[in-house]
């Protein structure tokens, strides 16, 4: 409830209390790590993600969170390592929904985009669309890449698709204007 109200400090205190009582509570570890990431307290976030992964090494959210943390810290190779491992092991076992699997490709595309490997990012985004075409994040990222590549018609199409999937058009006003210039 506190997080929904923007009171992360109170939510963090509650999760810490839960962890005092239950050291290995996966949800509390995950949510506190998330709060730490929002506060840019990356060392604390990493400690919680690593603790979570000791409790449950297969935790999708824990591993994805750790990869996101590595990316935010500019540790792109580490982030790619986590994501590549998740994609490889998921492909073998397919324990995830197609939506969760697609989000792994979106996450990896984000790291590739940060590394300026736009073609590799586009390949991952195509795979994400194949797995689950209902995720607006895919079209937003691909539209941004197309815009950077001066492929304005393709960018516009993707931004419009993101709007059709629920992204408020006002949020994309600047990006859509850039496709017209």
Residue ranges and their predicted role:
Residues 22, 32, 52, 70, ...:
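Short, conserved structural micro-motifs that define repeat-unit consensus positions
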Residues 26-27, 60-61, 94-103, 136-137, ...:
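Helix-start (N-cap) detector for alpha-helical repeat units in TPR-like alpha-solenoids
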């Amino acid at each position: 409830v506190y997080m929904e109200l923007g009171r992360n400090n109170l939510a963090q205190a509650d999760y810490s209390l839960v962890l005092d009582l239950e050291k290995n509570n996966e949800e509390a570890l995950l949510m506190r790590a998330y709060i730490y990431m929002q506060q840019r307290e990356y060392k604390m976030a990493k400690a919680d993600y690593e603790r979570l992964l000791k409790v449950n090494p297969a935790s999708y959210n824990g591993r994805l969170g750790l990869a996101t943390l590595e990316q935010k810290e500019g540790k792109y190779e580490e982030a790619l390592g986590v994501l590549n491992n998740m994609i490889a092991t998921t492909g073998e076992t397919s324990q995830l929904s197609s939506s969760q699997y697609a989000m792994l490709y979106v996450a990896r595309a984000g790291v590739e985009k940060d590394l300026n490997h736009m073609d590799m990012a586009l390949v991952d985004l195509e795979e994400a669309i194949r797995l689950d075409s209902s995720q607006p994040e895919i079209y937003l990222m691909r539209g941004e890449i197309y815009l950077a590549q001066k492929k304005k018609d393709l960018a516009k199409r993707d931004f419009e698709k993101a709007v059709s999937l629920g992204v408020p058009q006002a949020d994309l006003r600047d990006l859509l204007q850039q496709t017209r210039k």
